[in-house]
Amino acid sequence: MQNLIVAVVAYLIGSVSFAVIVSAAMGLDDPRSYGSGNPGATNVLRSGNKKAAILTLIGDAFKGWLPVWFVVHYGARYGLDETSVAIASVAVFLGHLYPVFFRFKGGKGVATAAGVLLAINPILGVATLLTWLIVAFFTRYSSLAALAAAVFAPIFDGFLFGPHVIALAIVVMSSLLVWRHRGNIAKLMRGQESRIGDKKKADAAAKPAGGSDV
């Protein structure tokens, strides 16, 4: 019963779309209506409002971090264990990808996954974030950076902690993240992927194929 509650609460937290909320609060267009159509920080950046993009990034990462951190640090007193941490991790991630509050049309999950990993273990989270930053810095492709981070996150986890139940949750999240970027993979192969900082007007024509969004 406890794990069911964890799953529901984490999923509902994940379903809060900060890209949509921040954009509405700041009088910006709905991020689902321009660029890649993805409600994520990278697409919000295409509006030209860096503050909105940063707030979206922080919000999406925080919502991934919050439920997992709570279970990690306070779960034992409620009869929760590592399985509960794994459930919270996947549930909050699924909430971002398929939010009940926004007709199950969510983002790609990179920032939320980063928050989850930081809550599981700060070293794991920082190592994965550095992977994203390095690839993004040299290529300016958010999608390629996300794919690299998704591949290396389970590797970092295995190297640091060995086999454990939470590793399965990390593999599931990484697999879902790669799946959500399948359109980006195709665009990268065609040389048509948009780069970080591209404006929404320049990118609008590419919307049906998916964007390179966090």
Curated annotation (Swiss-Prot):
EC assignment: 2.3.1.275
Cited function: Catalyzes the transfer of an acyl group from acyl-phosphate (acyl-PO(4)) to glycerol-3-phosphate (G3P) to form lysophosphatidic acid (LPA). This enzyme utilizes acyl-phosphate as fatty acyl donor, but not acyl-CoA or acyl-ACP.
Catalytic reaction equation(s): an acyl phosphate + sn-glycerol 3-phosphate = a 1-acyl-sn-glycero-3-phosphate + phosphate
Membrane-spanning residues: 4-24, 52-72, 82-102, 118-138, 159-179
The organism of origin for this protein: Paraburkholderia phytofirmans (strain DSM 17436 / LMG 22146 / PsJN)
Protein name as catalogued: Glycerol-3-phosphate acyltransferase
Similarity comment: Belongs to the PlsY family.
Gene Ontology molecular-function annotations: acyl-phosphate glycerol-3-phosphate acyltransferase activity
Keywords in alphabetical order: Cell inner membrane, Cell membrane, Lipid biosynthesis, Lipid metabolism, Membrane, Phospholipid biosynthesis, Phospholipid metabolism, Transferase, Transmembrane, Transmembrane helix
Single GO biological process annotation from the record: phospholipid biosynthetic process
